Amino acid sequence: MRQVVLSPGQVFDEALLERTSAFDANALMTATQIVADVRERGDAALREYTQRFDGVDLQTFRVAPEAIEEALASCDPQVSTALQHAARQVRDFHVRQRQQSWFTVRDDGAIVGSKVEPIEAVGIYVPGGRALYPSSVLMNAIPAQVAGVKRIVCATPPTRDGSLDPAILEACRIAGVTEVYSIGGAQAIAALAYGTETIRPVSKITGPGNAYVAAAKKVVSGDVGIDMIAGPSEVCVVADESADPALVAIDLMAQAEHDPLASCYLVCFDEAYAADVLRAIDSHMQQSARAEITRASLDDKGLVVVCPNMDAAIQTVNVIAPEHLELHVAGGMDLLGQVRNAGAIFMGEWTPEAVGDYVAGPNHTLPTGGTARFSSPLSVEDFVKKSSVIQYTPLALANEGEAIMAIAEHEGLWAHAQSVRLRLGMLQDALKVDGAAAPVIDMDAQPADAQADEEVGRAELTDE
C-alpha cells in the first residue's frame, strides 16, 4: 500500500487516490455496440453473446419454475436460513422508508399535493464472475417489493453448464422476484431496457456489474431509469491507537478480495501503527483463498494516509467520500456529525463492513468513486415515482392570476398568460350579470378523484 504523511495544516489531495473509473472508452464503445445489436436482433443476439461470453448455448433464457424448484432443493439449508434472516432485516429497515401521498388545502381552496406510485416493472442485475452474490438479490429486490413494484425481473449470467447458483434462486424466491433470466453482461442490460421476443422491457434497472454492465447502464439511461453507475468497490478505515491492527487489516482485506480494482484506504495517526496493520495483512494473507486478488488490490489501489490529528482525518474522509467508511476510533459517535460524505458508516470494532453487506438491514448498493458527495444508498425511494397534483378554485386563480401573467409575459409566453386572462375574464363576466350570484367557492374542495386515499392506499390529507 502506498503511504502519505500529512503535515499539520496540510489538506489531503484527492489526486492521490488514483481512482479507477466505472468504465473506460473501450468498454463504452463495446457496450454501445452490444446494446444496439440486442435492440435490433433481440433473442438471436442474446444467444450469440451468451455463447461467446458465458460459453453456453441457451435456447431459452427464462428460468422455468420447475428448474427453480430443482435448484432450491439443492440449496445449502444453512445458506437458505441465513438468507431468510437477512431478508427479514433488510425488509424491516426498508419498510421505514415508505413514502405516502399527501395533499394540502390552502385558505383559498387550492389543493396541491404529491401522489406516490410504484414503478410498474424493474430489472435487477446480479453479477457472476469471480463470486456469487445472492445478497445483491435481496438488496435490490426487497426495496422494490416494499415500494409496491408488481413485476421484479432478475437477470444473472449462467455458469458454464447453463445452471444458476441455487442460493441466487433461493434469494429470488425470498425477495419476491417474479421472473428470472439466465443472461449477463451488457446484453442483459439491453434486453431489460428494450425487450426481446421473449423478454418484456422494464422501466428501471438496478444492480452492480463489471465495466461493461456499467457502460451499458450508461447507454440505456436515457430510455429507462437506472440506480447509479457503480465503479469498483472501496473502503476507508479510520483507526486510532485503540483499534486492533489485526481487525483493521482483515477489514481492509475484506474489501480488497472483491476485485483487483477495489480501493482500500487506511487513515491513521502514526506510521508505526500503519506498519503494524501491514504486518497483520501479511499474516492474514497466508490463509486467504483469494490472496492473489487481494494482494493486487492492496498493492495497486491501497493507500495509507497518516494524519496529524482527528480533524485532518475527518477532512480526508470527506475528500475521499468512500463507499464504505469504518470508524475504529474512540468516541466515534461524537464524530458522526462531522462526516459529510460516505455511502455507509460502520461504527466501532464490532461492526465490520460484512454486517452491512449481508444482515444489518441498510442497503449495500452504495455510491462509489467519490459520488457519495451527492448520492445515497439504494432505497425504496428509487422504486417509486411521484406526480404533482394541483387543483385551483376560482378564488385561488383570482388571487394569483396577476402574478402568473406577469411572469409569463416576462418570459414571452403569450398563451400562458392568456390561459389565465381568459379565465379571469369569464369570472368577471359572471359577476357582472345582473342578479347573478358570485361563483360558489368550496373551501373544502378535494381533488377530482376524491377517493385518492383508497386508490393510493397510503394517501394522507393534511391541512396546513
Question: Where are the regions a protein language model picked out?
Answer:
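Long, low-complexity, intrinsically disordered segments
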Residues: 442-464
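Conserved NAD(P)+-binding/catalytic subdomain of aldehyde/semialdehyde dehydrogenases
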Residues: 176-247, 251-263
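N-terminal Rossmann-like NAD(P)+-binding subdomain of aldehyde/semialdehyde dehydrogenases
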Residues: 1-120, 443
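A conserved active-site cap/scaffold subdomain adjacent to cofactor or substrate pockets
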Residues: 228-300, 304
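Alpha-helix C-terminal capping segments
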Residues: 139-150, 173-175, 193-199, 217-219, ...
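C-terminal core of ALDH-fold dehydrogenases
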Residues: 319-435
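Conserved small-residue-rich beta-alpha loop and adjacent elements
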Residues: 104-170
